[in-house]
Amino acid sequence: MKILITGATGLIGNAVLEAALKKKFKVNYLTRDKDKIKNSIDCNGFYWDVNNDYIDLKCFEGVNVIINLVGEKIFQKWTKKSKKEILSSRIKPIDLLMKGIKRSNEIGIRSFVSASAIGIYQNDFEKNYTENETIDPQNFIQKAVYEWEKKSMSVRKLIPHTSILRIGLVLSKKNGYLKETDYPMKFGIGIQLGSGKQWQSWIHIDDIANIFLFIADTNPRGIYNAVAPNPLPQKLFLKKIRVCSFRKFMIIKLPSLILKFFFGERAYILLDSQRVSSKKILELGYEFAYKEVDEALNNLYKRNDNLT
């Protein structure tokens, strides 16, 4: 199998690329930085410039599956300009990919797999969200993810086997949630966000990478939640980190009002609760390497003693 990856230099994209090479797949990847183009027998980089509508059509040669992971970081300072960029950085690349496929006349592309986020679901402390949930976007993130998914699904006109993965909280030794919690823990403090009762639907970096490859290989259609089977409340998550990291820290409750004062509209990313089901991906046949957060954290802290 030969895969084309967008966003290959990001946290998830890099993990997908490495996992694909371990499985002996051939990989092409797109980058807007010419200095990051490297070529080998099994892995080749190609240049694209979304803003100037340019893509190297050679990137499509022999490709069976496209994995789309490109997009600007969401948790940044929100302005009218940055909000526009967060959305356009997810919409424009898909448009360019579709144009490129048409120009290339490549007929071997059988599957398109695109990232999405569980942030599309409403804040709720009781529901267990499935992919069948009616989507009624209210806030900026929900609206952005909704438009992202709509654009991804438009690829079905060219590639009928189009899938979307709604990704949860990614646990990695390199970046993301664990790195963000690391700084206060160095000073003996763990931060409970608001009530701490909000559900956190997480996934180990190895599992999210392997789910993308699993979907690429099995070639289904539709939307799948990419989360581990056992989510947990944020305050319990902190306690699990304390045990698995072998680090002593005091848990401090940071009230919602303070978070809203410092982060403004972005605070709901930290405070909202989404308990998300992995039943559909399990029924498809994916076997999680890390079903319990204890297993995931033990693995990550073992892999990098400097994580916290």
Q: Whereabouts are the PLM-identified features?
A:
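Alpha-helical substrate-binding/gating segment
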Residues: D182-G190, K197-L232
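Mid/C-terminal beta-alpha module of Rossmann-like enzyme folds, strongest
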Residues: D217-E265, N298, N304-T308
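NAD(P)H-binding glycine-rich loop region in Rossmannoid oxidoreductase-like domains
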Residues: N44-P93
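N-terminal Rossmann NAD(P)H-binding glycine-rich loop of SDR-like oxidoreductase domains
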Residues: I3-K23
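Non-catalytic, hydrophobic alpha-helical segments
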Residues: I66, I208, F212, A226, ...
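Conserved Rossmann-fold NAD(P)-dependent oxidoreductase catalytic core, especially the SDR/UDP-sugar
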Residues: D95-P137
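NAD(P)-dependent short-chain dehydrogenase/reductase
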Residues: N139, Y146, M153-R156, H161-I164, ...
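C-terminal amphipathic/interface module of NAD(P)-dependent oxidoreductases
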Residues: Y268-T308
